[in-house]
């Protein structure tokens, strides 16, 4: 399904009973978080707060609060069908050479579709209906949430940050939270390996004394938002991927103050710069771990201009102990990851990121084991193949007779197929999320791999146990008898 913009998506959700308009006055300071959190935990609807206390701009919350709504936002009708998107990304990430002329012709439409999905620049856009510049810029006029009692202040939580490194044609889109510290000042909290931070670092090396242009889109269409959090190949822009999801090119408009291109249908666009050397302490804020993060210093984003629709909608969320919206996104995107991993490692049967593991900190992999030590190869592959799993602390690998998504099955495999000394892999001094206060050094910590597979000769000298299974004919006979037994 195609959505022209965020409002079109809101309309469809409302028709499906997946969006609730809240007319009662609700405070963006803490109250919205509590309401959204209770709603998400009940797998409830997206919420449009039409009367935020002290503000005239409505707030959209809990938009991606169920995996089903994430799938809808990506143009799919079910979470299961997201695997087709994963297969497309796997093909684009590592396209195999054609096996012959017929195979080449069969793949040509896919390549043509991708090549034709570059963004389309338009000369006028709804996101520039109203222009606010200079001293008129006042971010305090927007209903930016303060999510938790111990937060340092209001936090922009769904910003689509648009950057471009020096001499690069491709723009980067990423979601990096921003703390409000002044009428025109936000702290840009991006991790050092993320695309925006890499663009900024390259800019400083090439232009050390010049300000770095940045644009931030708030309330883009769902395909563009979700494209920014999907493992898109480096050769494919997030705008092009959003076009593939949508079935139409992403319309963009050139920013007034820079050459950056923002989504034309966005509700609000912040234009500005990061001045060389301007940093500020960020935090603490309640995070997706369920804890407040420690204070750290990040660049300051100076907003020089705001462009927006005449009556904009502010898109917001909160993060906290799972389940929260990032955890729900992780559940849905899990289905996208599976085909990408299977393309590189065909022996993988399933891959699961338990939402209780803060979206990415633990992974469970089931596989068709083929040789001794195979599980360890898969562990290393998970940690190294996709940058999304750079921070995954625990990888559990087991055989394909185990259901990766059933903890009873997984715990059974761990406790019956593992020797702790032999089957535990420890890797020290690896990149770790700086929010992980359990690591001994900020940004650097260890990883653990658990080989819960059946052991082959060479891995053990003992006779390995055989799993107990009832004969199929006995099970069939009991099925026929069951209604006569009076047990149910």
Curated annotation (Swiss-Prot):
Highest rank taxon of the organism: Bacteria
Pathway: Cofactor biosynthesis; ubiquinone biosynthesis
Co-factor remark: Binds 1 prenylated FMN per subunit.
Disulfide bonds: none
Cofactor: prenylated FMN; Mn(2+)
Catalytic class of the enzyme: lyase
E.C. designation(s): 4.1.1.98
Locations listed in the record: Cell membrane
Role description: Catalyzes the decarboxylation of 3-octaprenyl-4-hydroxy benzoate to 2-octaprenylphenol, an intermediate step in ubiquinone biosynthesis.
Stated family: Belongs to the UbiD family.
Known partners and oligomeric status: Homohexamer.
Protein name: 3-octaprenyl-4-hydroxybenzoate carboxy-lyase
Gene encoding the protein: ubiD
